[in-house]
Amino acid sequence: EAVVVGWHRTFDFDRLDRASAAVRAGARFVATNMDATYPAPDGLLPGNGSLVAAVATAAGRQPEVAGKPEPPTVALVRARFGERGVVAGDRPSTDGALAEALGWPFALVVSSATLSGDEPSDHDAAFVGPSLAALADKVIGALVGS
């Protein structure tokens, strides 16, 4: 038996109750990511990390984290894509950390998540732009040129 917490808008007290009871009873507890917020057109929403925190608090146990930048994800990406690539994303704390763990450049897509000021900037971006489309030529040029 396992409880896997992934972000969704329908998380409610009944789900929290069932999930935390299962974890307290010994179910494996897995989080897909620990993002505190989720970017939306009208601003930031509570992210999966907020949902995970509720279950962890109620269950008295921390989860295994399966998403970026955790070692299982690093191994999966490396096995699937090899030694060269670029990680693109809007969160230096997860996407930038994944890029660093892989030894790949980080392409930062500016979003409400990065503009909020809540994101740490421990991971320098090799490329920065307002969208993936805006970064495509720079990123492709860097990959082809290296």
Where are the regions that the model predicts?
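Asp-based, Mg2+/Mn2+-dependent phosphohydrolase catalytic module
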Residues: 1-146
